[in-house]
């Protein structure tokens, strides 16, 4: 009688999809109003000039302009969007 004992079942073998967090637009890039700049957990980056903060701490541009990463103080980093001066 060629029998084989039942093997145990593995308790591994699962993986969740990533949440696509991180910086979406970098310093010096041109953005349009409403563009998402950063997706984050908590305020790793704080909103600066012309940048809004969403319910889930997403930072987004409130005007068309150029992105700038700055330091509020020694530890806190902020992101601002500055308008492009009008060309004559």
UniProtKB/Swiss-Prot annotation:
Residue ranges, annotated region (Disordered): 1-24
Presence of keyword Ribosomal protein: yes
GO molecular function terms listed in the Swiss-Prot or TrEMBL record: structural constituent of ribosome
Keywords noted in UniProt: Ribonucleoprotein, Ribosomal protein
One cellular component term from this protein's GO annotations in UniProt: cytosolic large ribosomal subunit
One GO term (biological process): translation
Domain of life of the source: Bacteria
Pfam families: Ribosomal_L27 (PF01016)
Stored SUPFAM superfamilies: Ribosomal L27 protein-like (SSF110324)
InterPro entries: Ribosomal_bL27 (IPR001684)
HAMAP family in alphabetical order: Ribosomal_bL27
Family as reported in the entry's similarity comment: Belongs to the bacterial ribosomal protein bL27 family.
Database matches in NCBIfam families: L27
PANTHER family: LARGE RIBOSOMAL SUBUNIT PROTEIN BL27M, RIBOSOMAL PROTEIN L27
Name of the molecule in the record: Large ribosomal subunit protein bL27
Organism: Syntrophobacter fumaroxidans (strain DSM 10017 / MPOB)
């Amino acid at each position: 009688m060629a029998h084989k004992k039942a093997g145990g079942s593995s308790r591994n073998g699962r993986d969740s999809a990533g949440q696509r967090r991180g910086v979406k637009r970098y310093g010096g890039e041109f953005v349009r109003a409403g563009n998402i700049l950063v997706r984050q957990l908590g305020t790793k980056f704080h909103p600066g000039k012309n940048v809004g903060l969403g319910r889930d701490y997403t930072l987004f541009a409130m005007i068309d302009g150029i992105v700038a990463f700055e330091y509020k103080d020694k530890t806190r980093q902020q992101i601002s969007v500055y308008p492009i001066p009008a060309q004559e």
